[in-house]
Amino acid sequence: MVCAGASEISMAQWASAYVESALGISKNIGDIIGPCLFAIMMGISRFFYGKYGEKLDLMKFMIASGILCLICYLLAALAPLPFLNLVGCSLCGFSVGIMWPGTISIASKKIPLGGTAMFAFLAMAGDLGGAVGPGIVGLVTQAANDNLKIGVLAGCVFPAVLVLSVLLLKRKREKV
């Protein structure tokens, strides 16, 4: 859940500044375009899973979403064209859309008697990731002479750890 929160909020929080610097547009337009495209794509992802979720394996969907998120971070950080950087930012919204609800669903199935305490712990873990993730991106950006692409590249660690965690959980589940 920490990695889900960090993956989502790191890109969402930095999207407007990233769009401004990558596309060279004004702050007002960047504040609208970056977060809006991210949010629209996130909504599409949640709508898609809400409509077709019962037909999909949640673990596989989470792994695919984490891999897509990693690709989006790489595209946002490394693509040579500003338009592709924007595509990476936007598609990241789609990739993170299932991470929080998916983590809650997996935990609910794994720990059916977890109750309120489990949901509180998951919320706290997501919030921790949402606080620490953007902070790490910001610190790396600042250390790299305000190069936001380097900061976003450092953010690749969040979806990578999420994918590894889900793979380990899936592997453990298959052994039982």
Regions found by a protein language model. Give the residues of each.
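Intracellular juxtamembrane helix-capping segments at the cytosolic ends
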Residues: 98-111
